Amino acid sequence: MMHSKKLMLGICLVLLIILIVGYVIMTKINSRSAQIKDTFNQTLKLYPTKNLEDFYDKEGFRDQEFEKGDKGNWIVDSEMVIELKDKKMESRSMVLYINRNTRTTKGNFIVRELWEDSKGYAQSKDTKYPVKMEHNRIIPTKPIADDKLRKEIENFKFFVQYGDFKDINDYKDGDISYNPNVPSYSAKYQLKNDDYNVKQLRKRYNIPTNKAPKLLLKGDGDLKGSSIGSKNLEFTFVENKEENIYFSDSINFKPTE
């Protein structure tokens, strides 16, 4: 009888330890997930910034990488990538370097093609069109003979100018991950086609699929902030061996080089 009581007490003690350890682990995971969400929210608060010149007066995260007196640079990048079956992969993107010290902005509109040659080797071709930004307008700095392309560049809008994540906290069933070795972190959500940002992308781009995208938020570097690290987001509509359709966007604050 005494042996039976000791055995039962031992089992209860083991179960209690398991419950305590499980609680500690779950608390740590939930805390990490909340920290990751908060880190992304700090960047997502920038959406929308309709006037790009507002970035001249926006302060980003600063650390020891910044020299004294350096106001830093915002780097804004939006890219649409489409690869259909048996077709070349084509991306059309624009990147701007917004210098807060000189209050000037320059960058490039980039058309990129990727394909495999007859021997199966990857080939690529990049065509860059230099631009500047004045009074919230994109202006090519070199003549462009193709009127359609010139208008595409002049009318280009970055995702940060129209994207809006005010409902991000309502997104359900997010897959949050963290790799302390890099370190890197991410959050993935399945969106619906009636999502505001998805509708905005379909309004501006000819997206050849009716599939609703997944939203992937990615970051690397210290969760508390780092000018060395980066954050970006990606709307993935299709991803397989034969086809890829996705839109990516990033806003990062860096020291002046």
Curated annotation (Swiss-Prot):
It is a single-pass membrane protein. Keywords: Cell membrane, Membrane, Transmembrane, Transmembrane helix. It is found in: Cell membrane. Its main location: membrane. Pfam families: DUF576 (PF04507). Disulfide bonds: none annotated. Belongs to the staphylococcal tandem lipoprotein family. NCBIfam families: SA_tandem_lipo. This is Uncharacterized protein SA2274. It comes from Staphylococcus aureus (strain N315).
